[in-house]
Structures are given as structure tokens and as C-alpha cells.
């Protein structure tokens, strides 16, 4: 997910997106622990997307 896509969303939309990605990250971690995750690099991407969203939320609230 690109930061350009994220910065155009409202704070409420960002929070919903963050919640969805957090749930997806949780599921990916469970699958990875039992060996069913085919692409473990996906976890890193999800963590980075959540961090980008958190950054965008802080920037919007600071305005």
C-alpha cells in the first residue's frame, strides 16, 4: 500500500483499515506458527502497512 493512497483517507477510514490489517496480521501470525503460511514475508508487509496508517493518523490529528 502506497502512502499516497493512505493520506487521502479520513481518520475514521484509516482506523477501520488499521483494524482490518491488524486482524489480518493476527491471522497470518497464527498460520505462520502452525506452518500453513505460504509467504512469511507477508507479515512484514502487513506490519509496515499498519505503521504507515499510524503515521498518517498522527499527521492528520496533529493538524
From Swiss-Prot:
Q: Which UniProt keywords apply?
A: Ribonucleoprotein, Ribosomal protein
Please give the superkingdom of this protein's source.
Answer: Bacteria
Enumerate the SUPFAM superfamilies for this protein.
Ribosomal protein L29 (L29p)
Molecular function terms in GO for this entry? structural constituent of ribosome
The record's Gene Ontology biological-process terms are: translation
Q: Which family does it belong to?
A: Belongs to the universal ribosomal protein uL29 family.
Return the protein name.
Large ribosomal subunit protein uL29
Amino acid at each position: 500500500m502506497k502512502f499516497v493512497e493512505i493520506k487521502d483517507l479520513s481518520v475514521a477510514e484509516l482506523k477501520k483499515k488499521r483494524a482490518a490489517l491488524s486482524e489480518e496480521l493476527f491471522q497470518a501470525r497464527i498460520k505462520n506458527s502452525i506452518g500453513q503460511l505460504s509467504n512469511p514475508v507477508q507479515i512484514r508487509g502487513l506490519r509496515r502497512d499498519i505503521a504507515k496508517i499510524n503515521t498518517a493518523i498522527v499527521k492528520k490529528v496533529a493538524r
